[in-house]
């Protein structure tokens, strides 16, 4: 399907280019004929180049996606600046803007390849326990065709440097199929992490449902504690509520209130779920949830998605008040479809949770 979309976009862009330039070429000149043939030649040559240079490395789908993104950016800028090219100033401006596409694509790769550590300090003055807690939140790892051992090794190193008490994996650990994952190597990295923390907990994301759900669930359960609409006590008076992924899937939604009721009064409750709450969601906010941790949005991943995500979610990234508590949305550690981020950055999140008297 990705290659079909690629061919379609190539032909559409080639046709638009031919019509645009053709109107400006007087008479029946050779250039106009060449442009007509380029509608067919451009996609064929592009696909041939990609397949011959990268198929053996297994990176053809990713490069196709990146090329499409670059071309869409190019076409959008070309269309927006077309009216300005009638003057010398407009032509210079257009060339400068178009020249930024390659640096932006390079920076977009760097935004995924060099993740950062984002830190938050949350104070709960009226809650137990008395000892502070450090949590590492990692969402949207997307193990599979795009990300593998190097991706996990870097994540493990970043988490170890943060020295958390608990590690929470907030869904989309697997991009789609477990067959695309080096499960032995991945299990080694998570086992190494599990030895150094007090708890390693997981919830499912939408991508776990895209593949063989039973197989994905069985493997993730072997790595640590998988929570599917369940509650686990981390410490005395500190509880983690883990929510299953439910959006767009035909299943009965367990009310969050029924899960929150399992947390004793006066105890601290942390909610871990993959997706932040959407505007029209029928499950209301529940008072008493002290900290909600989510991912899924990728903080838009590629501009201009950051503009449209607020139509779905109240927030798409960062730390925000939520009911009686705090909501933290991570941009995610990996990326979806392409190892490219424009206007967002891959990250792990470290939360220092303080209580009364600490």
Report the location of each language-model feature.
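Short N-terminal secondary-structure initiator segments
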Residues: 1-2, 109-120, 178-187, 214
